[in-house]
Amino acid sequence: MGDGTVDQQKPSFFWQIADDGWPVLALAGLLTILLTIMFVPLGTFALGMFVWLSHILRVPSRTTPQSAAVIVAPADGRVTEITKVARTNEFDPQVTEALRITIRTSLSDVQLQMAPIEGRVTDNFAIPGLFGGYEDMTAARADNERREITLTQDDGLSVMVVQLGGKTARQLVCRHHVGRFLRRGTPLGMARLAGVVELFIPADCTPQIAVGQHVLAGETAIARLPSRGRRRSSG
């Protein structure tokens, strides 16, 4: 759109593939054809892999909460950590804490990530690094490649989504340029495949989920914003 607004996308059928899923699916399709020509049983196995990839790379049908006070999950997966951490913010030096919610996406989850709030992209940049495992999250946060995406509401509240690379998540994708406005639940990007997503929100938000819970991107309410007048930024 000319004003930089991206409307929430609603899939018209089950197998609509996310834009960032097509490169993977195209390669899988080509491999399926080649293996079928070479040896039919291998082609049958590859076809099964193709169907599986189609499932996890699709645009899912999700019902996004309407309340403006709700922050939704940015990714499908299991919540592995909810922790208050020290943060700095050049726009508000008084902010010293943020709530960090860590979500681990598996190879059986939908890979498409979605905007947790309605707001404008104010930061989107990649930080080069390694692609180590997630067994030691402290090391992974320090050493692994990551992409940081900050969304800021009209009232100044901001949240940050961090895509964390890993052994299988080697492509961290978010094609939204700075200044683009996203609605809550709008496709945000993808960590191909099965990465970790960390969401940083104001420390005075109220979590609506627990460690171990499985969440759905764009649908599960994972936190509630503080009352107007007490809101703080977490970017």
What are these regions (language model features)?
Residues 1-235:
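Contiguous, well-folded functional domains in the mature portion of proteins
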